[in-house]
Regions:
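Alpha-helical segment of the N-proximal tetratricopeptide repeat
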Residues: 2-32, 53-56
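Short coil/turn connectors between adjacent alpha-helices in alpha-solenoid helical repeat scaffolds
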Residues: 48-67, 96-104, 136-151
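Canonical positions in the second alpha-helix
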Residues: 29, 76-77, 111, 158
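Residue-level recognition of tetratricopeptide repeat
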Residues: 11, 45, 52, 93, ...
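TPR alpha-solenoid repeat register
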Residues: 39, 87, 120-123
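Short coil turns that delineate tetratricopeptide repeat
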Residues: 34, 82, 116, 163-167
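"A position-specific structural signal for the A-helix of alpha-solenoid helical repeats
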Residues: 8, 42, 90, 126-129, ...
Length: 182
């Protein structure tokens, strides 16, 4: 089966909610194509969809899917294709999802650099979505107390990502627009 056929088969399984089936398809693809980041990324995406839809705890209170493996597969895909904005954004998103805020912020800075390095790669959508997720995660972690040290440290980062996600080249550029006389 070609890579496109495998991806189509896995996508169809995901659409039907058969995340475990998609993960199995990606496992087979990874075994035969260990140097292709698409397999690792696809497996991690399917696993994350499963957790988001079904939760990750079984009847005994144990993780059904190893979150560390999900993060590792996202990291591997991003590392194998360091200029791929989608892979890097997905890795950052998973880090936010798994409450790894400092690591997520570092990954988002890499995403900013990917956007700066190429006029053909638009990372604004990824940054805006990540900023929203980051603020949500910080609020949950701090019980909506933005005076805590972690909130004070990372809310400004999230706001910066949001501003860049709106298409401004910098916070300073956005401030110039805010200070313009109407």
């Amino acid at each position: 089966m070609s890579a496109d056929e495998v991806m189509t088969q896995a996508a169809q399984l995901i659409t039907r909610g058969d995340y475990a089936g998609a993960m199995t398809v990606f496992d087979g693809y990874i075994d035969s194509n260990p140097d292709d980041p698409a397999g690792y990324h696809g497996w991690a995406e399917a696993a994350l969809f499963d957790i988001q839809e079904n939760g990750n705890l079984d009847e005994k209170g144990k993780d059904r899917i190893n979150e560390g493996q999900i993060a590792a597969y996202f990291r591997r895909a991003a590392g194998m294709a360091p200029d791929n904005a989608d892979y890097n954004a997905a890795y950052a998103g998973a880090l936010v999802e798994f409450d790894r805020i400092p690591m997520a912020v570092r990954q988002l800075h890499k995403l900013v650099e990917i956007g700066k390095a190429s006029d053909e790669v638009d990372v604004s959508f990824h940054l805006y979505e990540a900023a929203r997720g980051l603020i949500d995660a910080i609020d949950l972690k701090t019980n909506f107390d933005r005076s805590t040290p972690i909130a004070r440290q990372y809310i400004s980062e999230a706001v910066t990502f949001a501003i860049l996600g709106l298409g401004f080249s910098s916070v300073e550029e956005a401030i110039e627009y805010l200070n313009m006389d109407a």
